[in-house]
């Protein structure tokens, strides 16, 4: 009985659960952090206080995904140029 259960093909419910995990993980680790990087890069100097507070909250919430992309993205602000 146990051998038959182990060797049987994966049920459709298991595949649906696995697909849901992959989808949610991809959203959490890839899609939302990239959108958050883009949004913060465009709006950094013109954010209001509540928008900045929500940005900090989103950074806290999506920190694992942001830290994955941090070594590859260079979003430094232009600054003052040569000093």
UniProtKB/Swiss-Prot annotation:
Keywords: Membrane, NAD, NADP, Plastoquinone, Quinone, Thylakoid, Translocase, Transmembrane, Transmembrane helix, Transport. Pfam families: NdhL (PF10716). The keyword Hydrolase does not apply. GO terms for cellular component: plasma membrane-derived thylakoid membrane. The chain crosses the membrane at residues 15-35, 53-73. It catalyses: a plastoquinone + NADH + (n+1) H(+)(in) = a plastoquinol + NAD(+) + n H(+)(out); a plastoquinone + NADPH + (n+1) H(+)(in) = a plastoquinol + NADP(+) + n H(+)(out). Its EC number is 7.1.1.-. InterPro entries: NADH-quinone_OxRdatse_su_L (IPR019654). It is a multi-pass membrane protein. It is found in: Cellular thylakoid membrane. GO terms for molecular function: oxidoreductase activity, acting on NAD(P)H, quinone or similar compound as acceptor; quinone binding. NDH-1 shuttles electrons from an unknown electron donor, via FMN and iron-sulfur (Fe-S) centers, to quinones in the respiratory and/or the photosynthetic chain. The immediate electron acceptor for the enzyme in this species is believed to be plastoquinone. Couples the redox reaction to proton translocation, and thus conserves the redox energy in a proton gradient. Cyanobacterial NDH-1 also plays a role in inorganic carbon-concentration. HAMAP family: NDH1_NDH1L. NDH-1 can be composed of about 15 different subunits; different subcomplexes with different compositions have been identified which probably have different functions. Belongs to the complex I NdhL subunit family. This is NAD(P)H-quinone oxidoreductase subunit L. It comes from Prochlorococcus marinus (strain MIT 9303).
């Amino acid at each position: 009985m146990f051998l038959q259960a182990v060797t049987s093909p994966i049920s459709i419910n298991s595949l649906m659960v696995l697909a849901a995990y992959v989808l949610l993980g991809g959203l959490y680790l890839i899609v939302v952090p990239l959108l958050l990087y883009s949004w913060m890069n465009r709006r950094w100097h013109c954010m209001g206080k509540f928008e900045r507070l929500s940005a900090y909250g989103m950074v806290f919430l999506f920190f694992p995904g942001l830290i994955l992309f941090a070594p590859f993205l260079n979003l430094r602000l232009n600054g003052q140029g040569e000093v």
